[in-house]
Structures are given as structure tokens and as C-alpha cells.
Amino acid sequence: MALLDFFLSRNKNTAHVAKERLQIIVAEQRKFKSEPDYLPQLKREILSVICKYVNIDPHMVTIQLEQKNEDISVLELNIILPD
């Protein structure tokens, strides 16, 4: 019986780990789907305007849209400017 219990308990642990991983993947996908359709284009246009006036690496600019509640969204723009 101990051998059978060993294999059965291991399957439950494996299933639990797989379930947690799947929940993480689904949460990440929901995060990206919650963005409006226009956001990628908006990010590109903002980046092009910044690069027009300041010579920076595009990787030094981060743009995020945060949903604070049902009525409020915040567009956060972080730029690391050269010296």
C-alpha cells in the first residue's frame, strides 16, 4: 500500500503544480487582453515623437496603461534621459 500511496500522492502534487502554472499563464494572457486595441499604435507613436526630439534608446522608454477602477485609467510613461 505504501508504494501505491507514494505514486498517488505524487500525481496530486504534480497536478497541483500544473494547475498553478496554468493559472499564472491565464492571468498573464488576461493582462494583455485587457489593453485597448489602440495601445500598441499609441506606444509606437509616442516613442517616435520622443525620439524625434531626444536621441535615446527605445528600450529606455516604458509605457504602461493601468486600470485603477472602472472609471479611471492611468497611462504611465517612464523615460531614462541621457546626460
From Swiss-Prot:
Recite the UniProt keywords alphabetically.
Cell cycle, Cell division
**Family annotation (Gene3D superfamilies):** Cell division topological specificity factor MinE
Annotated Pfam families: MinE
One of its GO biological process terms is:
cell division
The text of the family note is: Belongs to the MinE family.
What does this protein's UniProt record list under function? Prevents the cell division inhibition by proteins MinC and MinD at internal division sites while permitting inhibition at polar sites. This ensures cell division at the proper site by restricting the formation of a division septum at the midpoint of the long axis of the cell.
The protein depicted here goes by the name Cell division topological specificity factor
Species, as recorded: Buchnera aphidicola subsp. Schizaphis graminum (strain Sg)
Please name the taxonomic classification of the source: Bacteria, Pseudomonadati, Pseudomonadota, Gammaproteobacteria, Enterobacterales
